[in-house]
A protein has these predicted regions:
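Active-site-adjacent structural elements in enzyme catalytic cores
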Residues: 1-215
Length: 215
């Protein structure tokens, strides 16, 4: 069974948090933070079965704040997509494509222009461990200690795809794209790559790709 993340109304629903965990949960990036299960009391075991950790996040947009303030309890949160498919962008597509998965829809009049999964992080013994770098952190540049004389485009692998632009001493990672066996995911990869190249006025001198299948 795939583990699920939960959203809690505020920090009062958690206990024994380390200072860095509190800082991450309340940061503007608002990632999912993996916490030891004892820090999240009164949660059903089947949300993250056979695991020692559970993903937790706080509301990060007005609709989420209104929803969590109304129900005043933790809610399971997952992306609006069928397995292997990218999240849908429009309300009408959600109603059409997810009718076998959802009983009710809470819709919004603000269109989604760019897909971005929730970032996933944990506090490790030696600092922050980023498991999925996406919403809240992308497209921030990552400073590097070395300098590149070429513009490099790294297209990544076919599974769990993420691409990267390398210029001078900066790396620019895309958000998590997904498994490129799916045609819609490949379209998302192409659209995001074009957007990043436009934003950063980036033209690659070298293109790298991991061609090992199933990686």
């Amino acid at each position: 069974t795939k583990p699920l993340a939960i959203m809690v109304p505020d920090l009062q629903f958690l206990q024994d948090l380390a200072p860095q965990e509190t800082e991450l949960l309340t940061s503007s990036a608002a990632p999912i933070v993996l916490l030891a299960k004892h820090k999240v009391p009164n949660i059903a075991d089947n949300i993250a079965p056979h695991l020692q950790e559970i993903g937790v996040m706080l509301p990060s947009n007005p609709l989420q704040h209104l929803l969590l303030r109304t129900v005043n309890r933790p809610l399971v949160m997952t992306s609006a997509n069928a397995s292997g498919q990218p999240p849908v962008l429009k309300n009408e597509y959600a109603v059409e494509q997810l009718n076998d998965l959802a009983d009710f829809y809470l819709c919004h009049n603000r269109d989604i222009l760019q897909r971005a999964d929730d970032s996933l992080v944990r506090v490790a013994f030696d600092g922050l461990e980023t498991l999925r770098r996406a919403r809240g952190y992308v497209p921030d540049e990552i400073p590097l200690e070395t300098q590149s004389t070429k513009n490099v485009l790294a297209l990544g692998s076919d599974l769990k795809n993420t691409f990267c632009l390398l210029r001078h001493n900066k790396a620019i990672l895309s958000q998590h794209i997904g498994d490129t066996a799916n045609e819609q995911v490949r379209s998302q990869l192409s659209e995001n790559l074009a957007l990043f190249q436009q934003i950063y006025q980036f033209k690659p001198d070298i293109i790298a790709v991991d061609t090992h299948p199933g990686y």
